[in-house]
C-alpha cells in the first residue's frame, strides 16, 4: 500500500481560458506562478501551484495531483503500482514546479499524478479576494462508489463516512475527507465539485458578500452538512463547474479512528 498525505493540485481544461483565469486570480485570489500561451498555474499561498488551467475545446477536470509521503519515492510508487497491475508511467519535468511524477488512470478515467516534491512559490495570500486556506477536497462522479473507495485504499486513503451506499468519503490526513465519490454511472469521469477551505464562519460570510458584489449567484447554502459537519455553500465558476466554500469541518484522528469537531 502507498501513502499519500494531501491533495496537491487539480487541472482543468477550459474553452474560455481568459475568463476562468480571471476567476481564479480575481475571485478565488490565487497567485499566478506560471503562464504560457495555453496554460496557467495558480498557487493558494506557498506551493508552486494548486490549480492549473489549460486552453482546450473541452471543459472539465483533467488531472489530479496527490503528494506522496517523504519516505516513498516516485520511482518506488510507480514500481509498486505496476506490480499491482496498474499501468503507471514516470515522467520528469512534465509540469512546472514538479520535477518528477508517476501517472496512471483510475477505473473511471481520472488521470492521477503522484509526486513527492514541489517548488515553493511563497506568493502568500491575496487581499481583496476570497483567499481560501487551501484546496480542501475534491468530489468525483464514478460508476461505483464502493469500488472507488476500495481502489483508493491502495494509495493509503481511509474510508471515513458514507451517505447511504452511493456517496463514499475518504481521507489521507486529518481532514474529514480529501476525496469523495458519488455513484453516477452516466456521468462517471466528471467532477461533482471542488471545495476550498476557509478560515472560519466570518470568512465564509465575507466571501458570500464578495461573490454577491461580483454578481455570482449562490446555488445552495450556507448550511451544515451531515457528513463532515462542515458549513458549506456552493456556486458555479465561469465554466459551470460547481465550487464549494466551506469551514468548520470535523477533524479525523487516525490513531483513534474517530473525529473531533
Predicted regions and their residues:
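Short amphipathic alpha-helices within nucleic acid-binding modules
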Residues: 72-79, 204-209
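Conserved short beta-strand elements that form part of the metal-binding/catalytic scaffold
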Residues: 29-62, 110-118, 162-192, 197-201, ...
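N-terminal beta-strand motif that seeds the catalytic metal site of vicinal oxygen chelate
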Residues: 1-18, 61-66, 118-146, 161, ...
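Vicinal oxygen chelate
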Residues: 78-131, 168-169, 215-261
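Eukaryotic helix-linker segments that join adjacent hydrophobic helices
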Residues: 65, 71-74, 84
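Conserved active-site tyrosine of GNAT-family acetyltransferases
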Residues: 20-25, 81, 109, 148-152, ...
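Core segments of cupin and vicinal oxygen chelate
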Residues: 2-49, 93-95, 140-177
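Surface-exposed interaction/gating patches
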Residues: 130-208, 212-214
Amino acid at each position: 500500500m502507498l501513502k499519500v498525505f494531501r491533495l496537491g493540485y487539480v487541472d482543468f481544461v477550459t474553452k474560455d481560458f481568459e475568463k476562468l483565469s480571471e476567476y481564479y486570480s480575481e475571485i478565488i485570489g490565487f497567485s499566478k506562478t506560471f503562464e504560457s500561451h495555453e496554460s496557467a498555474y495558480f498557487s493558494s499561498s506557498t506551493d508552486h501551484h494548486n490549480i492549473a488551467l489549460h486552453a482546450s475545446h473541452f471543459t472539465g477536470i483533467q488531472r489530479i495531483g496527490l503528494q506522496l509521503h517523504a519516505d516513498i519515492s516516485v520511482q518506488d510508487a510507480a514500481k509498486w503500482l505496476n506490480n499491482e497491475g496498474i499501468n503507471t508511467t514516470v515522467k520528469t519535468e512534465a509540469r512546472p514546479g514538479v520535477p518528477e511524477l508517476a501517472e496512471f488512470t483510475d477505473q473511471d478515467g481520472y488521470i492521477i499524478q503522484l509526486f513527492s516534491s514541489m517548488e515553493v512559490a511563497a506568493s502568500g495570500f491575496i487581499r481583496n479576494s476570497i483567499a481560501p486556506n487551501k484546496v480542501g477536497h475534491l468530489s468525483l462522479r464514478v460508476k461505483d462508489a464502493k469500488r472507488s473507495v476500495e481502489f483508493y485504499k491502495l494509495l493509503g486513503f481511509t474510508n471515513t463516512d458514507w451517505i447511504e451506499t452511493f456517496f463514499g468519503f475518504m481521507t489521507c490526513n486529518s481532514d474529514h475527507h480529501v476525496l469523495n465519490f458519488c455513484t453516477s454511472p452516466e456521468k462517471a469521469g466528471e467532477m461533482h465539485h471542488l471545495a476550498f477551505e476557509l478560515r472560519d464562519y466570518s470568512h465564509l460570510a465575507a466571501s458570500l458578500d464578495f461573490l454577491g458584489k461580483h454578481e455570482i449567484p449562490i446555488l445552495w447554502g450556507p448550511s451544515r452538512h451531515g457528513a463532515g459537519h462542515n458549513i458549506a455553500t456552493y456556486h458555479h465558476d465561469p465554466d459551470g463547474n460547481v465550487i464549494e466554500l466551506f469551514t468548520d469541518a470535523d477533524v479525523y484522528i487516525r490513531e483513534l479512528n474517530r473525529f473531533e469537531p
